[in-house]
Design a protein with these regions (language model features):
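Anion (oxyanion) recognition and catalysis
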Residues: 91
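Structured binding elements
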Residues: 94
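Hydrophobic alpha-helical segments typical of transmembrane helices
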Residues: 19, 23-24, 108
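Short beta->alpha connector loops at strand-helix junctions that form conserved
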Residues: 100-102
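Conserved AMP-binding/adenylate-forming core of the ANL superfamily
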Residues: 16, 33-88, 105-111
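Flexible, non-catalytic linker and terminal segments flanking ANL/adenylate-forming cores
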Residues: 1-18
Length: 111
């Protein structure tokens, strides 16, 4: 017997209707001094204001490299704060982050 591969929750609640980037802007404006990201192993603690500034800086840098809406940006990284920056920066410009398994060997990545 084949069963569905997804779960369907309450469909009566409407979608938010804003982008991830806009949601980050709103949260950072409302709670600029609250913790947004903590990476203990990197000794990093960024507030929403700091996080938003870093995300916007990275988004501008990606756009300067001609990354635009719909483009794919691959990241081959371990669990670091910068991974989260890439996720939000690509979302802000409408690009798609492609996560490459950091356990891949070079020859697997080349394939």
């Amino acid at each position: 017997m084949v069963e569905g591969s997804y779960a369907c929750g309450n469909s009566q609640k409407p979608l938010i209707g804003i982008t991830i980037g806009e949601m980050l802007n709103r949260i950072a404006a409302a709670h600029p001094d609250s913790d947004a990201l903590i990476s203990v192993h990197q000794n990093i603690r960024w507030t929403y204001a700091e996080f938003l500034e870093r995300v916007n800086t990275l988004a501008r840098a990606l756009m300067a490299l001609d990354v635009e809406r719909g483009d794919r940006v691959a990241i081959w990284a371990l669990n670091y704060a910068e991974w989260v920056l890439v996720q939000f920066a690509t979302a802000k410009i409408g690009a798609i982050m492609v996560n490459i398994n950091p356990a891949y060997r070079t020859y697997e990545f080349e394939y």
